[in-house]
Amino acid sequence: MGKIAPKSTRSAAVSQGKILYCENDVNEMDEQSRVFEGAGYTVERVQGKPAAVEAFRNGTYDAAVLGHTLTKDERHHLAYMAKKSSEETQVLVLHASGKHPAVDFAIDSRKGAEEVLEVLNMLVQQKSLALAL
């Protein structure tokens, strides 16, 4: 069963955006979360699909990052849940193949943390521009 991990202590005032990051593996989540937080994002970390579903029901996010330790089925379902909670939420799937209608961008997580961060920055900027119009 999934559980919600402690939230980042970063102030929302300096945040680049609020992201929900979901993985099944806590160590992987901790490592990648540090990269996102270091870039100025407020990160809500959740472990497993049940915790992510709960988070989508109770919160709104600029982006959702679905990690590579989730199963293909979990990533597939959670992408829909992210969009159901808010059409404006950008969905980034790590280590995915193929195109899913609810996924805004998919990237091979083996590309490295900096490339993942670059894509996340692009997605959050796109959301900000779309909301400004």
Regions found by a protein language model. Give the residues of each.
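Conserved N-terminal glycine/acidic-rich loop preference
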Residues: Y61, T69, P101-S109
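Conserved acidic segment of CheY-like receiver
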Residues: S15-V26, Q32-F36, A64
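Conserved dinucleotide-binding and phosphotransfer motif residues
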Residues: G38-A39, S85
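Short acidic active-site motifs
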Residues: G48-A52, E74, E115
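Non-catalytic signal-transmission and effector/linker regions of two-component phosphorelay proteins
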Residues: M1-N24, H100, K111-L133
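Conserved phosphotransfer microenvironments
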Residues: D62-S86
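A short, hydrophobic beta-strand element within the central beta-sheet of small alpha/beta folds
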Residues: A79-A82, E88-K99, I107
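Acidic, metal-coordinating helix/loop segments flanking the phosphotransfer/catalytic sites
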Residues: R45-A63
